[in-house]
Amino acid sequence: HTVIDIGGQDVKVLQIDNGVMTNFVMNDKCAAGTGRFLDVMARVLEVKVEDLGTLGSQSTKYVGISSTCTVFAESEVISQLSMETNKCDIINGIHHSVANRVAGLAHRVGVRDQVVMTGGVAQNIGIVNALQEQLGHTIHTSPLTQYNGALGAALFAHQKYLKEQKG
């Protein structure tokens, strides 16, 4: 399985074989491709971050956002707005920019047939769709995907507790 976890501060891609992590890569050096990146873009566009997915899906094309740096991407978005570019097209471009960044990380560990996406960003259908397009794989998410990490930690702790009780 391939697990893609996009949170507020970092992006992680894991390769899982028979329940064991066999490969891992993480982008934690900058905000590009993270929930924080989307927060900044939503603020510049004057929309709610939770509306980005819906708005991006109303686009007929996407405006290329070439900068991976949040600060430079913010400047690109401001420039597009000053040219009166359709906000939905800009948002679609943002989704593709994030997907391109995440796909680059995913290709470093190798993408398997079963792809699962977790973290709050997985609630953004625009990013999920753009990433599916980039990877050529269906991406599975859950409605409460932002809690997957906490649930996994709780299960791990419970299993450890049970083992310790057996002595």
Predicted regions and their residues:
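Internal, active-site/partner-interface "lid" segment
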Residues: 47-79, 166-167
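Glycine-rich phosphate-binding loops at beta-strand->alpha-helix junctions
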Residues: 106-134, 145-149
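Adenine-nucleotide phosphate-binding core of ATP-dependent small-molecule kinases
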Residues: 73-106, 146
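Glycine-rich phosphate-binding loop plus the immediately following alpha-helix
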Residues: 18-61, 155, 159
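Active-site nucleophile and cofactor-binding loops and adjacent substrate-binding regions
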Residues: 4-8, 25-33, 91-95, 116-121, ...
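Glycine-rich phosphate-binding/hydrolytic loop that grips phosphoryl groups
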Residues: 35-39, 142-167
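Gly/Thr-rich phosphate-binding beta-strand-loop-beta motif of the actin/hexokinase/Hsp70
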Residues: 1-17
